[in-house]
A protein has these predicted regions:
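Alpha-helical transmembrane segments
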Residues: 4-12
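A residue-level marker of the well-folded mature domains of exported/periplasmic proteins
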Residues: 2-5, 17, 24-358
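Bacterial N-terminal signal peptides
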Residues: 12-20
């Protein structure tokens, strides 16, 4: 059975890595080693010396192969759309590119699956060493992987998983780097149980874009975590990851006098919108709000009492690991089929130990 590498985002490690990687400003292009000037013909080395130098050069070449020295690989990074999260992800990508001396070419699909497929095919025609893919949706991701296989170009997936496996493992991928969305959804359920205790209550679920892997699997994990508890989801609606839409959803529920004591959101944008609506209605003390993601606004909202808890993982670390894993594969090193980056709980007691990245 193949192993899954799990990386818990420990408080100190996540914060230090976020600060360190975000501050890297090196170029993503490879730097060529200076050329060695040949000795004049009249100063030919002795035979024994030449042999020794040749042996030494061969050993150094072998060492370079095993230690993964910088090589000028070209990696296409395909992003699904513009969000603050992917700005932070790119910080990690760029830092790793500078560290490993590879060239990165970006493409943003603007949340259009057909556009992303066309972008991927363009890179296949131009020629790249590897495609690092954060797909718009799983279906389009599968098409890209199939097309890339036909073009003999390896694909690594990150952030958004492809296929139905909860772990993110998918045949045809070099590897998947990111969170297990089912586990992530379960964390929000555990936060809800911690906040409400044994009394439980009635929950509103505000979801992301319908049909996306995060929306489907986060809901699945939440429902699994709430099994056997006294917390019942009585209403769910999509906000499409948008703060204003979540605010409107909660305002409408308040006007309808629906009774609930917790709002569980699949992202921090929605949570801050829900919390704002409750605060403006004078109901925040009676209703708990839970977010997901650990954004700057989300962490600040926990500090300000607008929301009561969220989750955290490092987007910078995720971007760095995507390129690090890609380079290892291109260098012929063994990589695991999945590298999981875990979300951890954030509450008012520990929020000051986390640093928002996006």
């Amino acid at each position: 059975m193949r192993r899954t590498v799990k990386r818990a985002v420990a408080v100190g490690m996540a914060c230090v890595m976020a600060a360190g990687l975000a501050g890297c400003t090196g170029s993503a292009n490879a730097t060529k080693a200076p050329e060695t000037t040949a000795a004049p013909a009249t100063e030919a080395p002795k035979t024994e010396e030449a042999k020794t130098e040749g042996e030494s050069s061969g050993e150094e070449a072998k060492a370079a192969e095993t230690t993964g020295e910088k090589k000028d690989y070209k990696i296409a990074v395909l992003l699904p759309g513009p969000t603050g999260y992917f700005v932070a992800t790119k910080e990690g990508v760029d830092a790793a590119a500078a560290e490993y001396g590879v060239t990165i070419e970006y493409a943003d699909a603007q949340w259009d699956a057909s556009k992303q497929l066309a972008q991927a095919e363009d890179f296949m025609v131009k020629g790249v060493d590897l495609i690092a893919l954060c797909c718009v949706d799983s279906g389009s991701g599968e098409k890209i992987v199939k097309s890339a296989q036909e073009s003999d170009i390896p694909v690594l997936a990150f952030t958004n998983a492809i296929g139905s496996e909860e772990t993110g493992e998918y045949a045809g991928l070099v590897s998947y780097v990111g969170q297990n969305e089912v586990n992530t959804g379960a964390v929000t359920g555990e936060i809800a149980k911690n906040l409400l205790g044994g009394d439980g209550g009635k929950a509103i679920l505000i979801e992301g874009v319908p049909g996306t892997t995060p929306q489907i699997n986060r809901k699945k994990g939440l429902e699994q975590a709430l099994e056997g508890s006294n917390i019942e989801i009585i209403y769910n609606q999509t906000s499409n990851w948008e703060k204003e839409q979540a605010l409107k959803i909660v305002e409408d529920l308040i006007q309808k006098k629906m009774e609930f004591n917790v709002v569980i959101c699949q992202d921090d944008n929605s949570a801050t919108g829900a919390g704002q609506a409750l605060k403006e209605a004078g109901m925040k003390e009676d209703v708990k709000v839970i977010g997901l993601g650990g954004s700057k606004d989300g962490l600040q909202a926990v500090k300000d009492g607008v929301i009561d808890g969220t989750t955290y993982m490092s987007a910078v670390e995720e971007g760095h690991l995507a390129i690090e894993t890609s380079v290892k594969y291109l260098n012929g090193e063994k990589v695991e089929p999945v590298t999981e980056i875990r979300q951890v709980e954030v509450n008012r007691d520990n929020v000051d130990t986390f640093k928002g990245e996006w």
